[in-house]
Amino acid sequence: MTAKAEFGVRVPVSGPLASKENILSTTQFAEKLGFDAIWVHDQITWSREQNSHHVSSGSVEAVVEGANPDFYEAVTTLSYLAGQTHSIKLGVAVIVLPLRNPVVIAKQLMNLDVLSGGRLLLGVGTGAPLVGKSFETVGVPFESRGEITDDYLSAMLAIFDQSPKSEYSGKYAKFSGVEIFPKPFQKPRPPIIVGGLGRALRRAALLGDGWIPANITPAGISEGIGRIMEIRKKKGITTKELIVGNEIFSSIDKDSSIARGNASATIASYAKSIGRGSEEVTLVGSPSEVSKKIESYVGAGVNMFELKFIYKDMASLRFQLEVFASDVLRSFR
Protein backbone atom coordinates (compact mmCIF):
# COMPACT_ATOMS: atom_id res chain seq x y z
CA MET A 1 0.00 0.00 0.00
CA THR A 2 1.38 3.41 -1.01
CA ALA A 3 1.98 5.78 1.89
CA LYS A 4 -0.09 8.95 2.00
CA ALA A 5 1.18 12.47 1.44
CA GLU A 6 -0.21 15.94 0.85
CA PHE A 7 0.60 17.96 -2.27
CA GLY A 8 0.58 21.71 -2.70
CA VAL A 9 1.37 23.98 -5.64
CA ARG A 10 3.55 27.08 -5.56
CA VAL A 11 1.58 29.82 -7.30
CA PRO A 12 3.26 32.54 -9.42
CA VAL A 13 3.74 35.32 -6.88
CA SER A 14 7.17 35.94 -8.43
CA GLY A 15 8.91 35.20 -11.70
CA PRO A 16 8.11 36.12 -15.29
CA LEU A 17 4.44 35.07 -15.09
CA ALA A 18 3.60 36.71 -11.76
CA SER A 19 0.26 38.53 -11.83
CA LYS A 20 -2.93 38.81 -9.81
CA GLU A 21 -4.83 36.91 -12.49
CA ASN A 22 -2.31 34.06 -12.70
CA ILE A 23 -2.05 33.73 -8.92
CA LEU A 24 -5.82 33.47 -8.57
CA SER A 25 -6.46 31.19 -11.54
CA THR A 26 -3.73 28.77 -10.44
CA THR A 27 -5.07 28.66 -6.90
CA GLN A 28 -8.66 28.02 -7.95
CA PHE A 29 -7.63 25.41 -10.53
CA ALA A 30 -5.47 23.59 -7.96
CA GLU A 31 -8.42 23.53 -5.56
CA LYS A 32 -10.72 22.20 -8.29
CA LEU A 33 -8.27 19.39 -9.11
CA GLY A 34 -8.00 18.28 -5.50
CA PHE A 35 -4.56 19.54 -4.48
CA ASP A 36 -4.23 19.98 -0.73
CA ALA A 37 -2.60 23.40 -0.63
CA ILE A 38 -1.18 26.33 -2.52
CA TRP A 39 2.07 27.95 -1.46
CA VAL A 40 3.64 31.38 -1.73
CA HIS A 41 7.11 32.51 -0.74
CA ASP A 42 8.38 35.76 0.74
CA GLN A 43 10.78 38.54 -0.17
CA ILE A 44 10.83 42.30 0.42
CA THR A 45 13.28 43.46 -2.25
CA TRP A 46 13.81 41.55 -5.50
CA SER A 47 16.00 42.73 -8.37
CA ARG A 48 15.69 42.32 -12.13
CA GLU A 49 18.84 40.21 -12.08
CA GLN A 50 17.37 37.87 -9.46
CA ASN A 51 14.11 37.74 -11.38
CA SER A 52 15.98 36.59 -14.50
CA HIS A 53 18.09 33.82 -12.99
CA HIS A 54 16.52 32.71 -9.70
CA VAL A 55 13.20 31.56 -11.15
CA SER A 56 11.09 29.40 -8.86
CA SER A 57 7.74 30.12 -10.56
CA GLY A 58 7.55 29.83 -14.35
CA SER A 59 10.76 29.24 -16.30
CA VAL A 60 13.82 31.12 -17.49
CA GLU A 61 12.52 30.84 -21.05
CA ALA A 62 9.54 33.00 -20.05
CA VAL A 63 11.70 35.86 -18.74
CA VAL A 64 11.18 39.16 -20.57
CA GLU A 65 14.24 41.41 -20.63
CA GLY A 66 13.69 44.63 -18.66
CA ALA A 67 10.35 43.62 -17.13
CA ASN A 68 9.61 44.72 -13.58
CA PRO A 69 10.54 42.05 -11.01
CA ASP A 70 7.09 41.76 -9.44
CA PHE A 71 7.05 39.80 -6.18
CA TYR A 72 3.67 39.73 -4.44
CA GLU A 73 3.77 40.01 -0.65
CA ALA A 74 2.98 36.77 1.14
CA VAL A 75 0.46 37.58 3.87
CA THR A 76 -1.70 39.98 1.88
CA THR A 77 -1.71 37.57 -1.07
CA LEU A 78 -2.85 34.66 1.10
CA SER A 79 -5.53 36.88 2.63
CA TYR A 80 -6.82 37.70 -0.85
CA LEU A 81 -6.81 34.02 -1.82
CA ALA A 82 -8.60 33.04 1.39
CA GLY A 83 -11.59 35.04 0.21
CA GLN A 84 -11.52 33.44 -3.25
CA THR A 85 -11.34 29.77 -2.20
CA HIS A 86 -13.22 27.33 0.00
CA SER A 87 -11.11 24.48 1.36
CA ILE A 88 -7.58 24.49 -0.03
CA LYS A 89 -4.85 25.14 2.55
CA LEU A 90 -2.85 28.36 2.31
CA GLY A 91 0.88 27.99 2.88
CA VAL A 92 3.90 30.26 2.98
CA ALA A 93 7.36 28.77 2.71
CA VAL A 94 8.82 30.68 4.21
CA ILE A 95 8.21 34.02 5.93
CA VAL A 96 11.65 35.64 6.29
CA LEU A 97 11.01 36.26 9.95
CA PRO A 98 13.85 38.67 10.87
CA LEU A 99 12.39 41.19 8.42
CA ARG A 100 9.03 41.31 10.23
CA ASN A 101 7.95 42.82 13.53
CA PRO A 102 7.01 39.69 15.51
CA VAL A 103 3.97 41.23 17.21
CA VAL A 104 2.55 42.65 14.00
CA ILE A 105 3.14 39.51 11.94
CA ALA A 106 1.64 37.34 14.71
CA LYS A 107 -1.49 39.51 14.65
CA GLN A 108 -1.71 39.33 10.85
CA LEU A 109 -1.28 35.56 10.77
CA MET A 110 -3.83 34.91 13.51
CA ASN A 111 -6.30 37.07 11.62
CA LEU A 112 -5.58 35.19 8.39
CA ASP A 113 -6.08 31.85 10.11
CA VAL A 114 -9.45 32.97 11.49
CA LEU A 115 -10.68 34.50 8.23
CA SER A 116 -9.68 31.39 6.26
CA GLY A 117 -11.34 29.00 8.70
CA GLY A 118 -8.06 27.47 9.85
CA ARG A 119 -6.32 26.91 6.53
CA LEU A 120 -2.95 28.55 7.23
CA LEU A 121 0.32 26.60 6.94
CA LEU A 122 3.04 28.78 8.45
CA GLY A 123 6.57 28.29 7.20
CA VAL A 124 9.28 30.40 8.84
CA GLY A 125 12.95 30.88 8.07
CA THR A 126 15.96 33.13 8.48
CA GLY A 127 16.53 34.22 4.89
CA ALA A 128 19.46 33.19 2.71
CA PRO A 129 22.48 35.22 1.48
CA LEU A 130 20.55 35.74 -1.75
CA VAL A 131 18.24 38.18 0.10
CA GLY A 132 20.91 40.18 1.91
CA LYS A 133 19.72 43.39 0.23
CA SER A 134 16.37 43.09 2.01
CA PHE A 135 18.13 43.00 5.38
CA GLU A 136 20.18 46.06 4.48
CA THR A 137 17.07 47.90 3.29
CA VAL A 138 14.98 47.09 6.36
CA GLY A 139 17.90 47.74 8.71
CA VAL A 140 18.30 44.27 10.19
CA PRO A 141 21.81 42.81 10.70
CA PHE A 142 22.08 39.84 8.38
CA GLU A 143 24.69 38.09 10.50
CA SER A 144 22.25 37.99 13.45
CA ARG A 145 19.35 36.55 11.50
CA GLY A 146 19.44 33.14 13.21
CA GLU A 147 19.13 34.39 16.79
CA ILE A 148 16.60 37.03 15.72
CA THR A 149 14.48 34.31 14.13
CA ASP A 150 14.58 32.19 17.30
CA ASP A 151 13.65 35.19 19.44
CA TYR A 152 10.86 36.39 17.17
CA LEU A 153 9.40 32.91 16.79
CA SER A 154 9.39 32.43 20.57
CA ALA A 155 7.62 35.78 20.92
CA MET A 156 5.02 34.76 18.35
CA LEU A 157 4.40 31.48 20.17
CA ALA A 158 3.71 33.47 23.33
CA ILE A 159 1.10 35.52 21.46
CA PHE A 160 -0.46 32.47 19.82
CA ASP A 161 -0.60 30.34 22.96
CA GLN A 162 -1.06 32.65 25.95
CA SER A 163 -4.49 34.01 26.88
CA PRO A 164 -5.93 36.38 27.86
CA LYS A 165 -2.64 38.24 28.24
CA SER A 166 0.69 37.51 26.60
CA GLU A 167 4.18 38.27 27.79
CA TYR A 168 7.66 37.59 26.52
CA SER A 169 11.14 38.87 27.31
CA GLY A 170 13.92 38.15 24.85
CA LYS A 171 16.94 39.89 23.37
CA TYR A 172 15.10 41.36 20.39
CA ALA A 173 11.43 41.23 21.45
CA LYS A 174 9.83 42.19 24.77
CA PHE A 175 6.24 42.76 25.84
CA SER A 176 4.13 42.21 28.94
CA GLY A 177 0.44 42.06 29.75
CA VAL A 178 -0.73 42.57 26.18
CA GLU A 179 -4.07 41.32 24.88
CA ILE A 180 -3.92 40.42 21.19
CA PHE A 181 -6.98 38.83 19.60
CA PRO A 182 -8.46 37.00 17.76
CA LYS A 183 -6.42 33.94 18.61
CA PRO A 184 -5.82 31.41 15.81
CA PHE A 185 -8.69 29.30 14.51
CA GLN A 186 -6.45 26.22 14.61
CA LYS A 187 -5.68 24.97 18.10
CA PRO A 188 -3.29 25.59 19.62
CA ARG A 189 -2.02 27.43 16.52
CA PRO A 190 -1.33 26.99 12.81
CA PRO A 191 1.40 24.40 12.21
CA ILE A 192 4.80 26.07 12.29
CA ILE A 193 7.08 24.55 9.68
CA VAL A 194 10.72 25.61 9.82
CA GLY A 195 12.63 26.00 6.58
CA GLY A 196 16.30 25.35 6.01
CA LEU A 197 19.20 23.09 6.91
CA GLY A 198 21.98 23.11 9.50
CA ARG A 199 20.96 25.16 12.54
CA ALA A 200 17.38 25.22 11.29
CA LEU A 201 17.04 21.60 12.45
CA ARG A 202 17.43 22.70 16.06
CA ARG A 203 14.83 25.44 15.50
CA ALA A 204 12.43 22.90 14.01
CA ALA A 205 13.00 20.51 16.91
CA LEU A 206 12.48 23.02 19.71
CA LEU A 207 10.11 25.65 18.29
CA GLY A 208 8.38 24.06 15.32
CA ASP A 209 5.82 21.47 14.37
CA GLY A 210 7.61 20.56 11.18
CA TRP A 211 10.52 21.04 8.80
CA ILE A 212 10.58 21.97 5.12
CA PRO A 213 13.94 21.85 3.32
CA ALA A 214 14.65 22.25 -0.40
CA ASN A 215 17.16 20.78 -2.86
CA ILE A 216 17.62 17.67 -0.76
CA THR A 217 17.84 13.92 -1.38
CA PRO A 218 15.77 11.27 0.40
CA ALA A 219 18.89 10.35 2.37
CA GLY A 220 19.21 13.98 3.45
CA ILE A 221 15.59 13.94 4.59
CA SER A 222 16.16 10.84 6.73
CA GLU A 223 19.28 12.34 8.25
CA GLY A 224 17.49 15.60 9.08
CA ILE A 225 14.55 13.83 10.71
CA GLY A 226 16.95 11.79 12.80
CA ARG A 227 18.72 14.93 13.98
CA ILE A 228 15.43 16.64 14.91
CA MET A 229 14.28 13.64 16.92
CA GLU A 230 17.66 13.38 18.63
CA ILE A 231 17.49 17.03 19.73
CA ARG A 232 13.94 16.59 21.04
CA LYS A 233 14.91 13.48 22.97
CA LYS A 234 17.87 15.23 24.63
CA LYS A 235 15.60 18.09 25.67
CA GLY A 236 12.97 15.73 27.04
CA ILE A 237 10.38 16.80 24.50
CA THR A 238 7.67 14.22 24.01
CA THR A 239 7.89 13.29 20.37
CA LYS A 240 4.84 14.44 18.49
CA GLU A 241 4.01 13.83 14.87
CA LEU A 242 6.43 15.76 12.70
CA ILE A 243 5.35 17.50 9.53
CA VAL A 244 8.10 16.89 6.99
CA GLY A 245 7.83 18.96 3.84
CA ASN A 246 9.84 19.10 0.66
CA GLU A 247 10.03 22.21 -1.51
CA ILE A 248 10.84 20.69 -4.88
CA PHE A 249 11.04 21.61 -8.55
CA SER A 250 8.62 19.61 -10.69
CA SER A 251 8.03 18.99 -14.38
CA ILE A 252 5.73 16.25 -15.63
CA ASP A 253 4.69 14.98 -19.05
CA LYS A 254 3.57 11.65 -20.47
CA ASP A 255 6.85 11.80 -22.40
CA SER A 256 9.71 12.03 -19.92
CA SER A 257 12.04 13.62 -22.49
CA ILE A 258 9.61 16.53 -22.86
CA ALA A 259 9.44 16.93 -19.08
CA ARG A 260 13.23 17.05 -18.87
CA GLY A 261 13.57 19.43 -21.79
CA ASN A 262 11.01 21.72 -20.20
CA ALA A 263 12.91 21.85 -16.91
CA SER A 264 16.62 21.70 -17.71
CA ALA A 265 17.43 25.38 -18.27
CA THR A 266 15.51 26.59 -15.22
CA ILE A 267 17.03 23.97 -12.91
CA ALA A 268 20.53 24.80 -14.16
CA SER A 269 20.01 28.56 -13.74
CA TYR A 270 18.55 28.17 -10.25
CA ALA A 271 21.33 25.81 -9.17
CA LYS A 272 23.92 28.34 -10.34
CA SER A 273 22.25 31.16 -8.40
CA ILE A 274 22.30 29.28 -5.07
CA GLY A 275 25.37 27.12 -5.62
CA ARG A 276 23.62 23.75 -5.37
CA GLY A 277 20.83 21.69 -6.87
CA SER A 278 20.39 19.22 -9.73
CA GLU A 279 17.76 17.02 -11.37
CA GLU A 280 18.54 14.44 -8.68
CA VAL A 281 16.58 16.52 -6.16
CA THR A 282 13.59 17.24 -8.41
CA LEU A 283 10.39 15.55 -9.54
CA VAL A 284 11.01 15.54 -13.29
CA GLY A 285 9.79 12.91 -15.73
CA SER A 286 6.79 10.85 -16.71
CA PRO A 287 3.99 10.15 -14.20
CA SER A 288 5.48 6.77 -13.31
CA GLU A 289 8.97 8.24 -12.87
CA VAL A 290 7.65 11.09 -10.73
CA SER A 291 5.62 8.65 -8.63
CA LYS A 292 8.71 6.53 -7.96
CA LYS A 293 10.65 9.60 -6.85
CA ILE A 294 7.80 10.62 -4.57
CA GLU A 295 7.73 7.12 -3.08
CA SER A 296 11.43 7.41 -2.23
CA TYR A 297 10.85 10.72 -0.46
CA VAL A 298 7.77 9.44 1.36
CA GLY A 299 9.76 6.40 2.42
CA ALA A 300 12.35 8.75 3.89
CA GLY A 301 9.68 10.55 5.92
CA VAL A 302 8.22 13.31 3.73
CA ASN A 303 4.48 13.75 4.21
CA MET A 304 3.94 17.09 2.46
CA PHE A 305 5.23 18.42 -0.87
CA GLU A 306 5.42 21.98 -2.15
CA LEU A 307 5.57 21.46 -5.92
CA LYS A 308 7.41 24.18 -7.83
CA PHE A 309 6.28 23.41 -11.37
CA ILE A 310 8.40 24.69 -14.24
CA TYR A 311 6.34 26.16 -17.09
CA LYS A 312 6.87 28.53 -20.01
CA ASP A 313 3.27 29.75 -19.99
CA MET A 314 0.07 29.26 -18.03
CA ALA A 315 -1.26 26.66 -20.46
CA SER A 316 1.78 24.51 -19.66
CA LEU A 317 1.13 24.85 -15.94
CA ARG A 318 -2.53 23.88 -16.27
CA PHE A 319 -1.56 20.85 -18.37
CA GLN A 320 0.99 19.69 -15.79
CA LEU A 321 -1.45 20.19 -12.92
CA GLU A 322 -4.01 18.05 -14.75
CA VAL A 323 -1.50 15.28 -15.48
CA PHE A 324 -0.21 15.28 -11.90
CA ALA A 325 -3.73 15.23 -10.46
CA SER A 326 -4.96 12.41 -12.69
CA ASP A 327 -1.86 10.20 -12.83
CA VAL A 328 0.01 10.83 -9.56
CA LEU A 329 -2.09 12.51 -6.89
CA ARG A 330 -4.64 9.75 -6.41
CA SER A 331 -1.96 7.13 -5.79
CA PHE A 332 -1.01 8.83 -2.52
CA ARG A 333 -4.52 9.29 -1.10
What are these regions (language model features)?
Residues 1-333:
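Active-site-adjacent structural elements that line small-molecule/cofactor binding pockets in enzymes
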